[in-house]
Design a protein with these regions (language model features):
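Glycine-rich phosphate-binding loop of ATP-dependent small-molecule kinases
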Residues: 1-144
Length: 144
């Protein structure tokens, strides 16, 4: 079983959190996810670290649950929407002498992903959807 770190799961445990206000809790949950990620890199014996990359509602979590649930590794369930953030995470993984692996999850139909995004319990602005999809693709090109 992998050790999964997800800002979305952390968000649910924050005081006064409600899905309608998800965007307001995102910065804090992402900060806590980064902190948990750093701790896992230091303390967890797994040698592989998977970074998920893809925009909001792209299917990353579903991919994780169906395809990665038997892996023995650390998994960061995030959008990887900035090159700076990706670079920092990759440097930390390498410094911990672990192997970084990036799985990019890109929806076959952006319109369908947007409809899924609009119908989620967790509410974010439309700009967040476009920012994470464009940013994750830019990051993927930067990494490769």
């Amino acid at each position: 079983m992998p050790l999964v770190i997800s800002a979305d799961e952390i968000k649910k445990k924050l005081p006064n959190y409600s899905p309608e206000k998800a965007e307001f809790f995102h910065r804090e949950s992402a900060r806590l996810a980064d902190k948990n990620f750093e701790k896992a890199l230091k303390e967890n014996p797994f040698k592989e670290v998977i970074l998920l990359c893809g925009g909001t509602a792209s299917g990353k979590t579903e991919f994780l649950v169906t395809q990665l649930n038997r892996k023995h590794c650390i998994i960061l369930d995030a959008t990887l929407s900035t090159e700076e953030g990706a670079g920092i995470k990759l440097k930390k993984i390498l410094k911990a002498k672990k192997k970084p692996i990036i799985y990019a999850v890109i929806p076959d139909d952006l319109k369908r992903a947007f409809i899924a995004f609009l119908n989620r319990d967790r509410k974010f602005s439309d700009a967040h959807f476009y920012m994470t999809h464009a940013g994750s693709r830019r990051t993927l090109l930067w990494v490769t």
